[in-house]
Amino acid sequence: MKFILYNLATAKEPWADEVSELYKKKISFFIPFDIQSLKAKKSAREDADFKRNEESELILKNINSDDYVVLFDERGSVLDSIQFSKKVENILGSSKKRAIFIIGGAFGVNEEVRKRADLKVALSPMVMNHLMAQAMSLEQIYRAFTIIKKIPYHNI
């Protein structure tokens, strides 16, 4: 199995790149892992629906029918780290070849992506930018593996 994180972030910050590389390396210790930035065409901020649909189509084009899809979405289930680790463990026990983790664009994703997601997880009831969402999702994926493997990291 391979885990892939798709994002639509357009902003670049040195700290976010460092965090992403750090957690990519840590997660790759447990499973083949990659972070892929999907690039949608630029459009005006006023075209929120157009941009959401265009980015959602791009996401769907990069998902195979047999992938397990996890969508990080503010409307998803609120899980604690133990609950999330159990979901990751179930994914690992499935017959899927890839697990795709998705962080939507600035305007979120459309209903088609939500329907395609096998699991929808809220990182927080608060809204955050993509760089923060990516940092939090990477840390939680890593934390899930340390819980599953009983590696001292999660201290609750």
Curated annotation (Swiss-Prot):
It comes from the Bacteria. It holds the Pfam family SPOUT_MTase. Transmembrane segments: none annotated. It catalyses: pseudouridine(1915) in 23S rRNA + S-adenosyl-L-methionine = N(3)-methylpseudouridine(1915) in 23S rRNA + S-adenosyl-L-homocysteine + H(+). InterPro entries: Alpha/beta_knot_MTases, RlmH-like, tRNA_m1G_MTases_N. S-adenosyl-L-methionine binds at G104, L123, S124, P125, M126, V127, M128. The keyword Nucleotidyltransferase does not apply. One of its GO terms (cellular component) is cytoplasm. Specifically methylates the pseudouridine at position 1915 (m3Psi1915) in 23S rRNA. This is Ribosomal RNA large subunit methyltransferase H. The gene is rlmH.
